[in-house]
Amino acid sequence: MKLWLVRHAQPLVDAGVCYGRLDVAADPAATRASAQALAQALPLHAALHTSPLQRCEHLAQSLCALRPDLASKTDDRLAEMDFGSWEGQRWDALGAHALDAWTQDFAHHPPGGGESVNHVMQRVAQALDSTRNSGQDTVWVTHAGVIRATRLLLAGQRQVQHAHEWPTEAVPFGAWEVHGLSR
C-alpha cells in the first residue's frame, strides 16, 4: 500500500505572506499541469483525499476530470496549519516578539491564536492512521505543513517539542512524494 503526498500548485499570493488556512486559489495553468502529470503516475482506483482549501480541491477536481476511476473526498484533517490572526499578514511584519513566542514553545503555542504544531501533528496522525487501516493506495492533495508532519509521523515521531525538529524542506508546488505504508 502506498501514500502519495501531493502539494497544491503555486498559490496566487504574494511572496512572504502567511497563508496557512487562508483560502487562496492556486495558479490554474500550474494546477492543470500538475493534474496531468499526476494522472499518469497514479494506480487505478486509488483513494483520493483532499484538503478543503480551494488550492487543493481544484487540483483534485482537475485530476478526477482526467481520471474517472478516481473520486475525491474532502478531509478537513488535511488542511494546512491555522495561523489565526497571522493569516494574510507578511511574515516580516509580525514582529520578533510574536515569532519568538512561537519558537520558544513550538509544540504548544498557537501562532496568531490559531493552531499549535502538536495539534497539527495529532490531526494528521489521525488521517494517517485511517489511511493505514484502509489498506488502499491513497492520494492526499494537501499542503507543505501536512506533508512535513506526515514525514515526521512516518519516521515514528508523533510530537514535536522544538522548532529545530520541524522539517524545513518542502515538496515543490504541484509535485508529490510517495511513501510505502504498512498496517
Predicted regions and their residues:
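Acidic, low-complexity terminal tails and accessory targeting/binding regions
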Residues: 1-2, 40, 81-92, 152-183
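Generic beta-sheet signal
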Residues: 3-4, 46, 136-145
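Short, active-site-adjacent cap segments at secondary-structure transitions
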Residues: 12, 55-57, 80-81, 146-149
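Short beta-strand scaffold positions
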Residues: 50-51, 122, 141-142
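Active-site catalytic microenvironments for nucleophilic, acid-base chemistry
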Residues: 62-66, 130, 153-157
